[in-house]
Amino acid sequence: MAPTKRKGERKDPVQVPKLLIRGGVEVLEVKTGVDSITEVECFLTPEMGDPDEHLRGFSKSISISDTFESDSPNRDMLPCYSVARIPLPNLNEDLTCGNILMWEAVTLKTEVIGVTSLMNVHSNGQATHDNGAGKPVQGTSFHFFSVGGEALELQGVLFNYRTKYPDGTIFPKNATVQSQVMNTEHKAYLDKNKAYPVECWVPDPTRNENTRYFGTLTGGENVPPVLHITNTATTVLLDEFGVGPLCKGDNLYLSAVDVCGMFTNRSGSQQWRGLSRYFKVQLRKRRVKNPYPISFLLTDLINRRTPRVDGQPMYGMDAQVEEVRVFEGTEELPGDPDMMRYVDKYGQLQTKML
């Protein structure tokens, strides 16, 4: 029996806004073909502190300050963001064309590596009772990862603005009491591995248009870690307009933090415990309007060849330049030097003798 025909008028396809510009790049069509897809597999290791050669993935035992003013943590106590920049195959031999190709991140498979190692309850841990096993890793945990075509942009927020962070870390400068809630001057790019303490920086929700990030924080003293492992979950990186992160300069940026909780030693001291994260990113080619005009490329080339001089300030608030004169062409010098120059209603420069 043939299926019955639908009654009523046929509905037109749903119209959605057409995206023109994403991350400062004018977006065009997707390039198809057998060579238009590539995949990147890698993993990022944790940066918990590593106080010695035997404690990779652990922080130093945490010590507590007596007052807010005296808080000065050791660098080995501070879990930091892990970050990597992955060079991708070059797509454009000629950057002077009107349209060029860019890699676009489409999907991601990711998971934490080594979750079963947290079942170890016999290595120097504090016993739960006289004849019991050691305490498992537990407490506050934070799991975060990002994929982008540019470095992750960060916003600084502090728990205690009077904390003195150690050398070798990058932290919000000139902190005030407003830094404990929101200070828009504390901005940064995640451009260095093992340098940005997790407790100081969060992804900036007002930016990161060309990056996808995901994170979960679970707080508490005795909260157990809850981690899943599977090779069937895929995260789609496309936005509501069907466009993913565009890899500028043929570079893919990845970052991660996986703090699983605290390990309690036999003595009662505690250390952060972190694990590695696996990434598998699928990318495709997308045609875009060339964001690098020839004038920009030539200027950049000339600037790179020009030696940089760290001299006295000649621009900005402390500029020592008093006056700059610009001349164009020649003109007659009148007997009476009184002249008035103005722009007429047609936009032409006029000189009137007074």
Curated annotation (Swiss-Prot):
Effect of residue 117 to T: In strain: Isolate YI, Isolate TKY-2A, Isolate MAD8-BR, Isolate N4, Isolate C1, Isolate CY, Isolate MY, Isolate AIC-1A and Isolate Tokyo-1
One of the protein's GO biological processes: virion attachment to host cell
GO molecular function: structural molecule activity
Residues annotated with Phosphothreonine modification: 330
Superkingdom per UniProt: Viruses
Keywords carried by this UniProt record: Capsid protein, Clathrin-mediated endocytosis of virus by host, Disulfide bond, Host nucleus, Host-virus interaction, Late protein, Phosphoprotein, T=7 icosahedral capsid protein, Viral attachment to host cell, Viral penetration into host cytoplasm, Virion, Virus endocytosis by host, Virus entry into host cell
Pfam families registered for this protein in UniProt: Polyoma_coat
GO CC annotation: host cell nucleus; T=7 icosahedral viral capsid
Function text: Forms an icosahedral capsid with a T=7 symmetry and a 40 nm diameter. The capsid is composed of 72 pentamers linked to each other by disulfide bonds and associated with VP2 or VP3 proteins. Interacts with a N-linked glycoprotein containing terminal alpha(2-6)-linked sialic acids on the cell surface to provide virion attachment to target cell. The serotonergic receptor 5HT2AR also acts as a cellular receptor for JCV on human glial cells. Once attached, the virions enter predominantly by a ligand-inducible clathrin-dependent pathway and traffic to the ER.
Domain remark text: The intrinsically disordered C-terminal arm interacts with neighboring pentamers. The unstructured nature of this region allows to make different interactions depending on the structural context: pentamers present at the 12 icosahedral fivefold axes bind five pentamers, whereas pentamers present at the 60 icosahedral six-fold axes interact with six pentamers.
Family: Belongs to the polyomaviruses coat protein VP1 family.
Record's protein name: Major capsid protein VP1
Organism: JC polyomavirus (JCPyV)
